[in-house]
Amino acid sequence: MRNTRRGIVFLLTAALAVWAAGSPQAQNGGGGVTTDFSGEWTVVRSQDNTENPWVGDFFGLPLNADGLARAETWDASLLSLPEYQCRPHGWAYIYRGPTQLRISKEVDSYSREIVAYQPEWHQSTNMPVFLDGRERPPAEAAHSWGGFSSATWEGDMLRIETSHLKEDYIRRDGAMATDEATVTTWWIRRGDILTWVNIIHDPTYLAEPLIRSSEYRLTVNSLVPPHPCTSVYEGLEKGKVPHFQLGENPFLKEIRARYGVAANRPTGGVDTIYPEYEQTLKDSAWTAGDRAANIGR
């Protein structure tokens, strides 16, 4: 299974390279690249629809044992802590959300070349993508939500390499990527459609690279609203950090009942990526269409 996953990453990378090689820009040696990614974009849902998962839903994420253990101890009450209330979404996740996207470009006043793109979403932070070949910071440099991103052209596609990220979720139910994670991103534009492909590598929490994509459509009347935020006290006991001990998260039983997952089958990890995993699931009231089913109680 591991070799299969690596093969998928290799084939995807190779396919993107072939696509780039066949473009007019690549045939001209990379000169005269004209693809412009700037503009206002609206999300056309993602391959997993809106990222608003049930607690315990780690299906399709190649978490290793440590990553799954970390996810299973997560308590949603953690988001009530003042330190978390105004926390922005990080680079490895934010493109998955349902908000509008604005990509601005910075143009050198002398050469007229694009030296950086500035993508921004609702509840995002500064996330510049540099095209001027600047040196990547040393490993001990400070990490941020946006990380450090440098980009190169592959034909008419833009390949972005991102490092120096803070620990952040890859799904908003406790599945995390550590500050050792790096992300390879491709921007691909076909007319008014922008395809955003991310491959997340994390040696600590992921057994294999996580490959996901989202689609955006160009629009002329979208708005990325401001996000003023002030943290407040929400009644949690001072000094308390909400979490569950391993094996004590009650919601893990609910997700098994909801989707008919047997006790000896994982709810996350490499095995859950592949179609064969679906064949191991049992019928449940939820999967039969009863959305009012009292699951797991």
Region spans (language model):
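PEST-like low-complexity, intrinsically disordered acidic/proline/serine-rich tracts
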Residues: 24-297
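Active-site bordering "gate/hinge" segments
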Residues: 3, 14, 101-103
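Bacterial N-terminal signal peptides that target proteins for export
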Residues: 1-11
